[in-house]
Amino acid sequence: MIIHSLLDTDLYKFTMMQAVLHQHPAAQVDYRFKCRTPGVDLAQFIDEISREIDALCRLRLREDEVDYLRSLRFIKPDFADFLALFHLDRKYLSLTASATHPGEIELTIRGPWLHTILFEVPLLAIINEVWFRNTSEPDFEEGRSRLREKVASLRSMPAGCKIADYGTRRRYSRQWHGELLPLLRDGLGEQFVGTSNVYFAKQYGLTPLGTMAHEYLQAFQALGPRLRDSQVAALESWAREYRGDLGIALSDVVGLDAFLRDFDLYFCKLFDGMRHDSGDPFEWGERVIAHLEAHRVDPRTKVLVFSDGLNIDKVMRLYQHFHTRCRLAFGVGTSLTNDLGPTPLQIVIKMVRCNGQPVAKLSDSPGKSMCEDIGYLRYLRDVFGLPPMAET
């Protein structure tokens, strides 16, 4: 069994789930899986993946796990009580081999947002681990050697250059993930600030990290009063739920231009910072700092979180570029948890509908956008004043 606990996921799934429970418990959503890596035959392992999903759906949180969640300052008692009764239901998930693209799988999730939000991360971890254990021989000593080199590189930097683990969804295996975290903790000391993985945070006494993901802002394209106001509605909803806690806003759901137009003086003061997850990180940082300064907010009081495809070299370059001008945080994923030699898979599960309406992410990186409805993508770009889509 690959997933042993419902805590083996990213913290932001729980923080979003709590907001959904309190504000949108009746919302219905659709998610869809996509493998961006060409030539990957996942269909041959569909039965194995399906058995792992069955095992996942039998899991419930243990009393000590619920108590751990209760101990987090932002988890409210009613949500912890709800989680004590919660389990993932297989009826909301469909897994078949693609009839039109040999070797590909069709994985969709459809049901109440509240009851499906926890599927994404463990499903991606399952697919990854099934793939790698059937197609590669792990070289853990090579992985340890590479990890030691990364630790040494970071140790050569000033103490303020710190990283966190964001690598659950694309890890090589649960066992390797569990091995590398104490190595990072012991090797980096205060330069390792925590992990997005709640299970391992509990196990190793690390700080669990995370706020919101793209799906939260995407959903408000259907839940909000007007499409043009969807980002504002999502951020205000978050502020109502957490009252200043968990104050990192995600900036690339409809692109940075549209985000900065919505992120006015009120949000600049209210939120602790912003997270970068697509596009050029140096350009993004410069624009965010300029935006804060234009609103008379000192960037040195705000956090810029970088989490898009980071490796240690990029972390060090970003730190050297920005560290005197703002506070910094770095979430490193695949480069930590899946650097054993085999090529990592580029796999995602994205929300594509909410309450029957299409929703979309207009990423700042080509190829990261995902939507089933081209007409809606054109409309979304028009509403937010973005350039028209290139015709193909």
From Swiss-Prot:
Any one GO molecular-function label of the UniProt entry: nicotinate phosphoribosyltransferase activity
Pathway field: Cofactor biosynthesis; NAD(+) biosynthesis; nicotinate D-ribonucleotide from nicotinate: step 1/1
PTM text: Transiently phosphorylated on a His residue during the reaction cycle. Phosphorylation strongly increases the affinity for substrates and increases the rate of nicotinate D-ribonucleotide production. Dephosphorylation regenerates the low-affinity form of the enzyme, leading to product release.
Keywords linked to the UniProt accession: Ligase, Phosphoprotein, Pyridine nucleotide biosynthesis
Enzyme Commission number: 6.3.4.21
Keyword Phosphoprotein listed: yes
CDD domains recorded: PncB_like
Gene Ontology cellular component list: cytosol
Disulfide bridge map: none
GO biological process: NAD biosynthetic process via the salvage pathway
Known catalytic reactions: nicotinate + 5-phospho-alpha-D-ribose 1-diphosphate + ATP + H2O = nicotinate beta-D-ribonucleotide + ADP + phosphate + diphosphate
Modified residues (Phosphohistidine): 214
Root EC class: ligase
HAMAP family, per the entry: NAPRTase
Function statement: Catalyzes the synthesis of beta-nicotinate D-ribonucleotide from nicotinate and 5-phospho-D-ribose 1-phosphate at the expense of ATP.
Similarity remark: Belongs to the NAPRTase family.
Name assigned to this protein: Nicotinate phosphoribosyltransferase
Species annotation: Xanthomonas axonopodis pv. citri (strain 306)
Gene: pncB
